[in-house]
């Protein structure tokens, strides 16, 4: 079992133990969903399985998707349109207002999330999107 599957397994187990209605999944754009293009013109070359898996996650009632990006607002609008073309929607962008600060945790500058999908978190987009798709399809089959 690879790292991303372990992270989802752990998050879903905690969800059940704690009685939460959903988990929060933070997702980066560059070098995670799309291959980074260091030019002014974006190429929108997605990693294999990325868009298909994100569409599945969009439909999953137990997952709240948070887009995590440093993209400028005008470029972000282009990305959101591109995601919409693939029927992918993010519930939040760069934040999570559903989880307030507590006595122990301050979420003013770092949003609360259960699983992070980012190449800088160790996510391997060349392999992990496919593994994640099969994992999530298995969960959906169990719910039937």
Label each PLM-derived region with a short phrase.
Residues 1-144:
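HAD-like aspartate-dependent phosphatase fold
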């Amino acid at each position: 079992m690879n790292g991303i599957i372990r992270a989802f397994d752990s998050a879903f187990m905690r969800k059940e133990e704690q009685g939460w209605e959903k988990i929060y999944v933070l997702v980066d754009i560059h070098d995670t969903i799309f291959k980074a293009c260091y030019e002014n013109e974006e190429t929108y070359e997605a990693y294999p399985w990325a868009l298909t898996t994100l569409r599945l996650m969009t439909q999953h009632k137990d997952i709240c998707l948070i887009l995590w990006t440093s993209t400028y607002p005008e470029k972000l609008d282009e990305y959101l349109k591109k995601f919409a073309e693939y029927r992918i929607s993010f519930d939040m962008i760069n934040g999570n207002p559903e989880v307030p600060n507590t006595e122990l945790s301050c979420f003013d500058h770092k949003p609360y999330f259960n699983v992070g999908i980012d190449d800088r978190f160790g996510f391997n987009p060349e392999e992990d999107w496919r593994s994640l798709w099969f994992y999530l399809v298995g969960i959906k089959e169990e719910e039937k």
